[in-house]
Amino acid sequence: MSDPMDTSIADQSFDWKKAVWTLKTSPKTKLFVWKALHGAIPAGEALRARQINVDGKCKRCNLPETIDHLFFHCPFAKQVWTSAPVFPSIEYNGSIVLRNQWINLISRKNLPPTGVEGQLAPWILWGIWTARNNLVFNDKLTSAAETLSKAIYLAREWGTCQTISSPLPAVPPTLA
């Protein structure tokens, strides 16, 4: 496994605030993205590199489960990303490395009628991760369409909750 600090993410010019901490997404999703960008997600090959005796292969396609494979190179992940309602669309021209493509992914515009105000990429990563965990731990296969729909739903729901105005001030009842 390569050292996450050997990539452009370690560059002093990388804007962590813009790339992670100011994303319009839930705090747990921000932390998840931060961990993914640092190579700290417990995917199969990462666990094996830590001497944990697990099968390091992807449960969907049986290839080595690296973070980049899990989120981009697995046929399941490719299907999720290519179906994502963003502009410009995600194209696969060679190898995609999460740490090198993150700013590009969060810069994409959501197409209507998603109703998502912020970036969709963090929610898609989270959706792929939870679909993977459902397969690994619950033996439940989730389709790419279901994964993408859930990511859009969660992004929209979280955004709606953030824009709900504060409740009206309480007015004591009048005494007659």
PLM features: what roles do these ranges have?
Residues 1-176:
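Primary recognition of RNase H-like, Mg2+-dependent phosphodiesterase/nuclease domains
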